[in-house]
Amino acid sequence: MKLDTLANTVGEWLRGTGPESDIVMSSRVRLARNVAQFPFVSRATEQDRADIERFLRERIATSPAGSALEYIDVGGLDDVDRQFLVERQLISRELAEAQGARAVAIDGREQVSLMINEEDHLRIQCMHSGLDLEGVWRQILAVDEAVGKVVPYAYHPRFGYLTACPTNVGTGIRVSVMLHLPALVITRQIDKVFRSLHKISLAVRGLYGEGSQAMGDFYQISNQTTLGKTEEELLQQVGDVVPVLIDYERRAREFLVRETEQNVHDQVSRAFGILRTAQTISAEETMQLLSRVRMGVLLGLIGDVNIADINSLLVRTQPAHLQKLRGVELDTRDRNIERARYLRQHFEGGEPRTNAN
C-alpha cells in the first residue's frame, strides 16, 4: 500500500453516508488481544517484539481475513508516514511513537486495521461512518474469529481475555463513537453533558483518542472498563447514550437558529470566509473553522458544500497529509501557508448564502 496514493483517497468512515452522520462522524469497536506464548509488550525484549511481529504477520497472512489486508511495517516508516496513519485513525499515537518491531494491517476501505505491538500484541479495530455499532460489531467479530483460528489468544476461563491494562481484561473491547457537538459547545452545555457521562462510567476523549485534546468540537465517547460485562452489554451501554447526545445537539442547534440566528449565520459566514481567503492558517484554527462550516452546511446556511468534503478536509489539512499531498517535508510556517493555499483552492466557487433564512 503506497501511502502517497492513500492520501488522495477517503476512507469509508469519512464519507458521511452512515446513519445520523450529521452528528456522528464514526462508530468504532476495538478488541485487545495477546498471544499466549509471548510476554506482554511492556515486559518484552527487543527480540521478543520482533518475534511477536513476525509470528503475527505470518499467522494473519494465512488467516481467512489475511487476503483482504495490506501489511505495513510501521517501524520502517519515517515520522511523517507514521503521523499520516494516525491522522487517518488507522493507528494510534502510541503505536506511532513506540520503539522496536511494530506493524499494521489495513483493508482497502480503511474500515479494518490490525495493530501489532501497541500496548497489546494485537489490537483489532473496525470503523464505520455514522452510528452503526451493530454493523461494526458484526464485522470485527468476523475478523476476530478469523484471526483466532490461527493465533492462540491469551485467555483465562475466569477472567476472559488477558490484556496489558487491567481495565481491558475480560472482553478486551473498547466501543467508541465520534460526535461533532459544536452547538453544545457554543451554548456552554458541553461540560454538563460530560459530567453526566462520567457518572455512568463513560469516557470522553479528543479526536485522536486517549490523552488527546478535543479539536473542532469533535469528541469520542467510549466505555472505560470491560471486566464483568459482556460485549453486548458494553455495546448497549454506549449505544443507548448516543441517541440522547444526538438529541441534545440537535436541540441546541435549533435553539441557536431560533434565538441567535443572525449571530450563528455571522459565525458560519466568517469561518467560511477565512477558510476561502486566508494566506496562512494553523491546523488548530482550521479545525475550529471547519467545525463551524460543517454545522452551517447542516443548518442550510452554506450552499455548494457537502459534508463529505468537510469531513475529508478535516483530515487532509492535518500536518502529515499536507506533506504527503505536496510530496515534500514542510516546517510549521510552510505547512500553514500550504494549508491556506489548499483550502482556497478547494473552496473556490463555494459561496455562503446572503441571508439566514
Can you describe what each PLM-predicted range is?
Residues 1-158, 173, 187, 192-194, ...:
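Long, Pro/Ser/Thr-rich low-complexity/intrinsically disordered regulatory tracts in eukaryotic proteins
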